[in-house]
Regions:
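N-terminal secretory/targeting leader peptides
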Residues: 2-4, 10-15, 21-110, 128-322
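A gly/proline- and charged-residue-enriched helix-loop-helix capping module
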Residues: 111-121
Length: 322
């Protein structure tokens, strides 16, 4: 059982981060993922909880109005949404700390991911505050693997594969391993698959099932590449503009959503495998040579992250390793 930490209410960043907005009649919370993926379930749970607490909130899955995780803070600052869910790795250009949870082969279980989350949470909150946002909750993803047109279990099968990755680290790792990798928003994947310009997708069974990737990619290699996070944020001015009861409803719903998301991950892997089998997906394991190739390629990527993340990032990795 993963321990869900009890945490104090987050202090609100100063309103100097942006002009305080007029109190809205209700909030919207967006994610680029489908309603059936675990982040989509999270925004729905949050919306229901906050609404029950007296603040009307509408959940908007599937990338409403072109929303993408990489533009999370811009969307909040522009007032497009009051809150958003974002895949953490997509925010690596804002702060390298957001790449931490998707570093390859760093975590091997939900418990590992939770421990790394606890160590990194203050840094995530501080990075969000610098962007005029408040960290609301975290969502774990099941482990990442390769959705492919043909089985990919050997280095030869990976070589030249046109594969979507979800962040700059994944792109570097898979290129070093011989693939033709590029980082794409998950919302762009279907169009590229339909056009035939993509052979494979780095994602979890959860994300792939949400988009029914088996329509194009009927094989999944269980590489256990990473157990990454999505993070949810609110615009600090929107949160500060609420009356005390409204702020309490948001923060209580966020805490309940965090607990729900980390409890849900426990059975998610088995449930995803069942759905994949029911839809004819072939499940494969990488052979020892491919595992070795990926781990070797990952070492330099992790070292590059360590060098770019500064003392704070290195301290988190050291504490995690200890």
């Amino acid at each position: 059982m993963i321990r869900i930490p009890r945490r104090p209410l987050l202090a609100l960043p100063a309103l100097a981060a942006g002009r305080a907005l007029a109190q809205p009649p209700g909030w919207t919370v967006a994610t680029e993922y489908p309603a059936t993926a675990i982040p989509g379930e999270g925004v729905a749970h949050f919306a229901a909880g906050a609404s029950a607490g007296g603040l009307p909130v509408t959940a908007l899955p599937d990338g409403p109005a072109g929303y993408r995780s990489a533009a999370a803070f811009e969307a909040l600052a522009a007032g497009r949404f009051a809150a958003v869910d974002a895949f953490a790795g997509a925010l690596g250009g804002v702060d390298p700390l957001f790449l931490l949870s998707s570093l390859p082969f760093l975590t091997a279980s939900p418990a590992d991911a939770a421990r790394l989350r606890d160590l990194a949470r203050p840094g995530y909150a501080a990075a969000a505050a610098r962007q005029g946002a408040v960290l609301l909750w975290t969502t774990p993803w099941p482990p990442s693997g390769f959705w492919t047109r043909e089985p990919v279990t050997t280095p030869a099968a990976l070589r030249g594969l046109r594969i979507r990755t979800y962040d700059s680290t994944g792109t570097a790792v898979l290129r070093a391993a011989g693939a033709a990798a590029e980082a794409l928003s998950f919302a762009e994947v279907e169009t590229r698959l339909e056009a035939g310009t993509l052979d494979a997708v780095l994602s979890s069974g959860d994300g792939g099932a949400g988009r029914r990737l088996w329509r194009w990619l009927p094989h999944f290699t269980e590489a256990s590449y990473a157990w990454p996070l999505s993070l949810a944020f609110a615009a600090a001015p929107r949160l500060a503009a609420l009356p005390p009861a409204g702020r309490a409803a948001v923060l209580a719903a966020a805490a309940e959503t965090e607990a729900r998301q980390w409890q849900a991950i426990e059975g998610r892997l088995a449930a995803n495998r069942q759905v994949m089998r029911e839809n004819g997906v072939g499940l494969h394991a990488p052979d020892p040579a491919l595992r070795g190739l990926l781990r070797e390629a990952a070492r330099s990527a992790v070292e590059a992250w360590r060098a770019g993340a500064g003392e704070a990032g290195r301290a988190i990795l050291a504490a995690y390793a200890g």
